[in-house]
Structure formats: C-alpha cells, structure tokens
Amino acid sequence: MGKTIPRFLEQLDLIKSFVGLATGAGALYLLYKAVRTGLKCHPPLCSNSPICIARLAIERERHGRDSGEIRRLLNSLDCKQDEYTRSMILHNITRCVYLLEAEASSCTMDDIDLVADMLDEKDNSVKIQALNALKAFSGIRKFRLKIQEHCIKVLELISTIWDLELHVAGLRLLNNLPLPDYVHPQLRRVMPALMEIIQSDCILAQVQAVRLLSYLAQKNDLLYDILNCQVRPNFLNLFQSSQPGSLLFEVLVFAEHLSEGRNATHYRAVKWHYNEQSLHEALFGDESRLADRLLSLVIHPEEEVQIQACKVIVSLQCPQDLGSRPSSCRPSHSCFKTGK
C-alpha cells in the first residue's frame, strides 16, 4: 500500500503534464487560427482606416488598375455633409493622394477647385484639412498653376484667423509653391501677421513662416517691406542658442538673405528710412546686439547652425558687390564694430 500511493502520485503528475501540454497546444492552435483569419479578412474598399488605404496602393500596384477611392471621396464632397465628415473626407483624400499618386494625377482641375472651395467653410478643421489636401496635390506638377490661383485666399486665412494649426497647414502649402508676382501686394499686407507668427510659441509655425519670409526676402520689390516690418523688442531672442536647431537654422538663413539684399548695389543706391521698431533696426541698427548672438552660435552643438552663423557674419562684414575684392571689405557699422 505504501508503494502504491507514490506511484499513483507520479502517474497523476504525468497526467497533469500531458493535460497542460494539450491545453497549451490547443491555445496556440486557436491563436494561429485567429491570426490567420485576421490576415485573410479584407475590410471593404470604403473603409477609412490607414491600413485599408495602404492596401489600396498595394492592390493597384499589383493589378495595374485604379482603386476608384479618390474619385469616390471627391464625389462625396459634393454631398451635404456635416463639418466633421467633410474634415475626415478631406483627410482621407490627402492620404490617398500621397499613396496613389498615379491615380491622383488623373484628377481634374475642377477637382482642385472643389477641394479649394472647402477653404470657405466656417469650421477651421475643414479649412485645415483642405489646405493639407491642396498641399498633397501640389506635389503633382500639373496642378501647381491651378493651386497658385488660390494663394491669395490662403494668405487671407493666415492673416485673419489666429489658429496655429491652420498657419502651419497654410504656410506649408505656400512654401511648396512658386508664388507668382501678382500675389506680392497681398504678401505686403500679410507681413505683419507673418512676423507675429515668427514670434509666437509654435515651433512648426515659426519655422514655416521664417522659411516663407526668407524666400520673399530674395524678391527685390519686397525686401524693404520686410525690413521695415515692425517687430517686438525681444526679436533677437530667436537667435538664442536655447532655441531648437531647426528654427535657428531657418532664422539664420533669413538673416543672411536680408543682409545680402540690403548690401546689394541697387538697394544701397536708394536712401531708405526705417521705423525705430523695424526688423532692420533689430538686426542691423546701431543698437543691435545681433553680433553677440551670432558669435555665441558659432560654437552651437549643431554643425549646420555653426556654418550658417558664420555665413551671416561674413555677409555682414563684406557687402555683396565687394565680396570679390577682399581688400575692400570693411566691417558693417551696425554689427561687429571696430574696437569691439
């Protein structure tokens, strides 16, 4: 009897082990079936999930045919939808344009106008998604001229609505387009708003606004308007080493373009007058501390910031038309003064 009980317990442990193995194997099999079923399960083409839209791109590549998804989404914009639905439709159009570029290329100019019409909606989220969709379409060359026609509307939105997400979307669109000369009058009117965005607390909006003004600073007929634009007394805080490297780099490029522009022969041939709180006085005036900020950025941890700071210093010391004659270069009277 004493020997029988231990043997029985051993057999019981063995049975438990077999049961455990069987249970584990069964669970694994059920998990395998669930995963396999999930992989085989294809949501309908009308699904708005990112996975579904990505699958559309793959299917189109595989079978060489249009999914029809962009057309379906554009057609649904014609229907009366609530603001949230319109916003989501535009969001999905944006994703589809990036994923299905060949299919997006078959869209028409009327489709671009349809998307641009959404800029007149009252809800800011609809405006933002419409701007994002236009930005996506602007990557297709044939639509760029058509989208340019709506630049004035975009500038109006940026200057009249204080919504940083809208600013980012609108400025990204403008920075992706060559701006025609006929929008320059509108650009002059929105420059104070652009300066306010540059001095805001939203890094993304600041970077985009500086990038746009840096591009415009290279336009001869806009340079004075930019330099005479009013800025806050603490504008030079944008050149502090504590600022994000991406913003510092763009601000330094902007300063270089302004310095080169004001040193150009045709610009110096005119006697310009600037207001006391202008960007010109903040950067190049007799009381400017830009030189000190630039010197501190020469040892910035990021190499591209260091290089760009050096470029600004060179542009300040050597006027553009004297750059080919080093012996004639002389320090600017506004920065790096003799004896300092």
Curated annotation (Swiss-Prot):
Subcellular compartments: Nucleus; Mitochondrion outer membrane
Region (Disordered): 321-340
One Pfam family here: Arm_2
Phenotype seen when the gene is deleted: Knockout male mice are infertile due to asthenozoospermia and abnormal sperm morphology. Mutant animals show no significant abnormalities in the gross appearance of the testis or epididymis compared with controls, but have multiple sperm mid-piece defects such as absent mitochondrial sheath, and scattered or forked axoneme.
ARM repeats: 100-139, 179-218, 278-318
Keyword terms of this UniProt record: Differentiation, Membrane, Mitochondrion, Mitochondrion outer membrane, Nucleus, Repeat, Spermatogenesis
Membrane topology: Peripheral membrane protein
A Gene Ontology cellular-component term: nucleus
Family matches, as Gene3D superfamilies: Leucine-rich Repeat Variant
Main location per the UniProt record: nucleus
Stretches with biased composition (Low complexity): 324-340
Assembly and oligomerization: Interacts with TBC1D15, TBC1D21, GK2 and IMMT. Interacts with VDAC2 and VDAC3 in a TBC1D21-dependent manner. Interacts (via ARM domains) with RBBP4.
Main function: Essential for male fertility and sperm mitochondrial sheath formation. Required for proper mitochondrial elongation and coiling along the flagellum during the formation of the mitochondrial sheath. Facilitates the growth and aggressiveness of neuroblastoma cells. Increases the EZH2 activity and H3K27me3 levels in a RBBP4-dependent manner, and facilitates the enrichment of polycomb repressive complex 2 and H3K27me3 on gene promoters, resulting in transcriptional repression of tumor suppressors affecting the proliferation, invasion, and metastasis of tumor cells.
Designated name of the protein: Armadillo repeat-containing protein 12
Lineage: Eukaryota, Metazoa, Chordata, Craniata, Vertebrata
Gene this chain is encoded by: Armc12
